[in-house]
UniProtKB/Swiss-Prot annotation:
Pfam name, any one: UPF0102
Name of the protein this chain belongs to: UPF0102 protein Dtur_1530
Top-rank taxon, per record: Bacteria
GO molecular function: nucleic acid binding
CDD domains in UniProt: PoNe_Nuclease
Species in which this protein is naturally found: Dictyoglomus turgidum (strain DSM 6724 / Z-1310)
Protein family: Belongs to the UPF0102 family.
Signal peptide range in chain numbering: none
Length: 118
């Protein structure tokens, strides 16, 4: 299983997680020239940008630890572009992280959803 496949498994799990809790997924893999946002969703008057981090082992630490300050700033800039291009207005904008650990077979062993992560 390559990194792209691992990432897709994590994003698929996150979309199911969000949908089952009343979120409406608006976009997946929203790309601009300098990066992307994994998932954009809404729940009521809240617009949520979700960074999904998925790993098969903890050799490099917990998945959430790889969301650096620079990555957070990049996501915020992409979010600004998204809101401006779509001309959206929400009462609140939130940045969440989904951290997922997979088994070698690609099954979700552990996950943690962090609302308002940054």
């Amino acid at each position: 299983m390559n990194n792209k496949e691992i990432g897709k498994l994590g994003e698929d799990f996150t979309v199911e997680f969000l949908s089952s809790r009343g979120f409406i997924v608006l976009e997946r893999n929203y790309k601009v020239s300098f990066g992307e946002i994994d998932i954009i969703a809404r729940k009521g008057d809240i617009l949520i940008f979700v960074e999904v981090k998925t790993r098969r082992n903890l050799d490099f630490g917990m998945p959430v630890e790889s969301v650096s300050f620079e990555k957070q700033n990049r996501i915020k800039k992409i979010a600004e572009i998204y809101v401006k291009n779509k001309q959206l207005r929400f009462k609140e904008i939130r940045f969440d992280i989904m951290s997922i650990i997979l088994s070698p077979k690609g099954e979700v062993l552990n996950w943690e959803y962090l609302p308002n992560a940054f």
